[in-house]
Amino acid sequence: MSDITYQQARKLGLKEVKSRNGRGEDPYLPALEALLPGVNSLSEVDLGSIRIDIDQVAGTRNVGRREAFSASFYPLLEENSEFAAKWSRLAASHLKEGIRDPITAVEYLNRFYVVEGHKRVSVLRFFGAATVRAEVKRLLPPKSEDTEIRVYYEFLDFYKVTHISCIRLTHLGSYPLLLDLLCGEDRTVWDEDRQRSFLSGVYRFRKVYKDSPLGSALTQDGALVRYLQIFGPAALLSRTPGELKTDLAAIVPELNSIKNDSSPVLVTDPAEAPRGIISRLVHPGVKELRAAFLHDKDPETSFWTYAHEQGRVAAQASLEGRVETTGVFRMEDRDFDETIRELRDAGYNMVFTTTSRLLPATLTAAAAYQDVKFLNCSVNVSHPILRCYYPRMYEAKFLTGIIAGAMCDSDVVRYISDYPAYSTLASINAFALGVKTVSPRSRVLLHWSSVTDAKGPMERSGVAAVSGQDSLVRDARRRNLGLFLRLDGKLVHAASSSWRWSTFYRKIFESVLDGSWSDLNSTSEQGQSINYWWGLKAGVVDVQLGDCVPPGTAQLVQLLRRQIADGGFRPFDGPLYDQSGTLRIQTGQVLTPLQILEMDWLVDNVDGEIPSLDRLTPPARELVKIQDAMEDTPET
């Protein structure tokens, strides 16, 4: 009489075969040599004896054993067979003392195929084991541009440091993102203790996630990456299952964002239409507001911080005591969570962090303190539990380009930018198009101030106009900011594209006070992040003209300014070509705000290049990596 355990396992196997046949699917074990005819020619790397996730055991190496098992490794042979007897003895041994002998397998594209030990895998799968010990040889596919192959080689870099193979990600960039989250700049190879600690956190997270209502929303490893983005590795290792459940409940909008593959909602102008009576009843607004501004530096050493502080103070003064604000400086030297807790206990219910360097900490705080409104000064960020903001500077840059092209007495204009972040390339291109509008033969020489090995365009002679850093306040000429021209042998201030933080902060305060802030809450709850990207129309950016600008040029600039603000003129109307001569924007094509924001090319009258990450100074590299990490969407 056959063993009852084998009968139960075989019943599951026969049921799976019937179900798969009904769906027109192969019911038996996948065989790697059938899936990959050239498998014998692949290079091999001996990984030795490692513990692998049993869910990653995808099939068998050779076709000979595949019909003895269903696709999920349940046995299929008759109950009175020698195979069944061996399977039953192995099952009894497992229940008594566990299966100790490792299987032999090959790994291909982070899936494992059994060479020897099929029944051991079958028994372990039936009893719900999580892992199995295996002697593994890795089969390396040739490198190619195929997405799956490229992701796999990113996985190999991840594995080289962690020796963790159970994380399954399929999007380009996901493994480098995960490695950065876990290790930062430290690429020291993990020892067994660190591996065990991390895997313990992973399996605990998977169990909680699987048992939650979100368990079928997206892949568990995609959810894991987003969890690590928000709470960090320390939380994964230390949280109890109950605390993990609470954390997951706090980031439902974040997980919905992944599930829906949501891009940020770019709010390009403040709401101008009067709110309906239903909206006012549902979201009536507040009478008083307390807002804290957190800066990584202080106003004495940072012009950026100084400008935001001026905007904060002016915005508060304009609202006649309805808003109380405070500034907190040098957050780089403070405990972020402790600072937020103290502010919240003091009654502050709105927090602005004024640099993307504080974005990761702001994200963690937004998950922990859901009764506080958080905003970070960055853009194109896909995190719905906070809001982000940044000026639409390319509109003003186009206008300063008009001035440079009209007044420059040579065909060479220099443009100095800081580092390649979102919206930066749109500003460069808009300036170059402004130059080209009035001076078709002029070239714009691009220089990056944050590039360590900068050369090339800056060495060219004949430069008679320089567009430098934007003006954050009104004293542009005194601080040598904006556009300068060499006229009659002297360097003369011609124009500045300026940032009006006081206007932005006042309008955001007003939206909370009148309740219109909450009109966008349902968007966030559905998983879409709110990014304010206001420009000329909102009064958040503007252009200041120097005394040297001729009346005719000034009139042209003011005319175009009004038309851009009203939507009657678009700087990026086609046809537009990039530096290689490729048509990027066709005649009549209207770019969406997101397409403008995510420009990753330069127009054809720009001389220079977009620097790679490794050429940037460490501070600039840090900021770019933070913005990339915060915009990345893990696996759906």
Set out the residue ranges of the language-model regions.
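Short, charged/polar connector segments at secondary-structure boundaries
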Residues: 1-119, 126, 171-183, 210-273
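Glycine- and acidic-residue-rich phosphate-binding/metal-coordinating active-site segment common to enzymes
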Residues: 104, 108-109, 115-178
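Segments of small-molecule ligand-sensing domains
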Residues: 515-635
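Extracytoplasmic "Venus flytrap"
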Residues: 290-310, 315, 326-333, 423-425
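Flexible loop/hinge segments that line or gate small-molecule binding clefts
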Residues: 367-390
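An alpha-beta-alpha
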Residues: 312, 399-442, 526-548
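Periplasmic-binding protein-like
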Residues: 348-356, 375-377, 463-472, 491, ...
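Hydrophobic alpha-helical segments within soluble ligand-binding/sensing domains
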Residues: 389-411, 498-519
